[in-house]
């Protein structure tokens, strides 16, 4: 039987394709269709590192659009507005607010909201060759009109008046000084090469953090697209280019500077974090030489943090004598005791008789304002948008009692699991250690999260911010280093995990959401230790129209000493989560104590030996 079966099946089964040709082609056609469909999916995945539109928070990734007919080529979106949504929609303007101008008469006229009023101003009218590229760059960035603060500040600056501006977060302050500065410079330094006007640092922008400096540089690059303007951020890598463009006495004479900034030296605050993680080098390392820029090519706009710029001025490597426009962004922070020792010499170094100054911030305490007016001609023109020192009205603010540190973490997890914390979001904490603790905890929860603080190298911070903008990271745990100026238009919720130390800190933190008229949400956790300071923040919520429980408004006001104490240092808190012991941290502290004890012991031994030797010499 077996042999008969083998005989019948030895040749194998044969299929006559010619006989069943029609049936066979039906299956082949289906296979080809399936293969074609799969290849299209693979190609789409390969080319589409693009996210689905539901996950593309900032609008950075291209999404396919089906056009029935070919249309004229649309203007591409610029890097400046890469996080603001689709290039086909204009950026929504913030809600209209009352703008108050005070100062010596006659007060300057505000610009019209249409863009041509910027380049056709009677005192600084640009030609079509000068103004055309600027208008084109603004159009590419989806900017089709000026906002209130930009009209007011632009009018002041174009009429050569020093200006002090207080405007809410997200109202467009950066463009309010960048645009008129570009208009007043008229031509790039490259076109003015060899002339006095094209030498040195022509315009200077000073900001408290490196991250904000990089963001402002991006704005300048976007609005100067199409012309060869020279702008840069002052870093270790660009120091040489800066002092070659605006050489000081030490560079001209070939002498070494007479001062040296120590590694890691800062202003006592983590915000001046550019130098915290990389050595600035000694003066000998960057010994001044004869300028390698003999043509004297200047820098149109230099964006700098105070510590590094002050170092160059103090070592006589850079001259700001030709600088005609000086802007202090986040000026209340720059005029505080932490930065004032560096900022005052910078302002003094801008010795051009025609120098024009502009100070801007979302908050301006009385002390900082009086100090600012001393540096402004005739006290400057004071521009206030809305109510001074108030929170942005587009943010829904609330306070949440959590009871303890473990309660904070539980509340945060509940917000995430219940969908009340949509991505992308920012979580503010009070210190570097707590940022790292919370970051590690959330990573273990499986959340796409990163941390940004002054303890990280700037390259790591830049990478984390970039990932956050493109949607690769959904949450950022941050310290005060990102509380000011940073523009994340896609952020929907801000969590104050640790209670803010001051009202300005609270206003700047929650100002990272609800920008440019978009709705946002801010939730602030508080515990028993935050009780004495709860009333001040509750008053901010009430002034913004947010509901506040009556008991918070009836609480005792904090004393002046309590306010000063909190402003100097945040309250001590238990580890994030409040549960268990951090064995690694305890081991690190123990090791540090052992090293310090060993050093003291060796020092005492050396002193003891020295005393014995002196005694023996006396006896001899």
From Swiss-Prot:
Q: Please tell me which stretches of this chain the record labels as motif Q motif.
A: 142-150
User: Where does the Helicase C-terminal domain lie?
Assistant: 394-556
What the entry lists under Gene3D superfamilies is as follows:
P-loop containing nucleotide triphosphate hydrolases
Annotated catalysed reactions: ATP + H2O = ADP + phosphate + H(+)
* Region forming the signal peptide: none
| Keywords, alphabetical | ATP-binding, Helicase, Hydrolase, Nucleotide-binding, Nucleus, Ribosome biogenesis, RNA-binding, rRNA processing
InterPro entries to which the protein is assigned, alphabetical: DEAD/DEAH_box_helicase_dom, DEAD_box_RNA_helicase, Helicase_ATP-bd, Helicase_C-like, P-loop_NTPase
Q: Biased-composition ranges for Acidic residues?
A: 71-82, 266-278
**Pfam families the UniProt entry points to:** DEAD, Helicase_C
Q: Which SUPFAM superfamilies is this protein grouped with?
A: P-loop containing nucleoside triphosphate hydrolases
Instruction: Supply one GO CC term from the record.
Output: cytosol
Where is the segment annotated Disordered?
53-115, 244-292, 556-620
What are the EC numbers? 3.6.4.13
Cellular location of this protein? Nucleus, Nucleolus
Compositional bias (Basic residues): 562-575
Q: Where is this motif: DEAD box?
A: 329-332
Helicase ATP-binding domain residues: 154-382
Q: Where is the composition biased (Basic and acidic residues)?
A: 58-70, 252-265, 582-598, 605-614
**Its Gene Ontology biological processes?**
rRNA processing
**Similarity annotation:** Belongs to the DEAD box helicase family. DDX52/ROK1 subfamily.
Q: What is this protein called?
A: ATP-dependent RNA helicase ROK1
Organism name: Cryptococcus neoformans var. neoformans serotype D (strain B-3501A)
Q: What is the lineage of its organism?
A: Eukaryota, Fungi, Dikarya, Basidiomycota, Agaricomycotina
Gene of this entry = ROK1
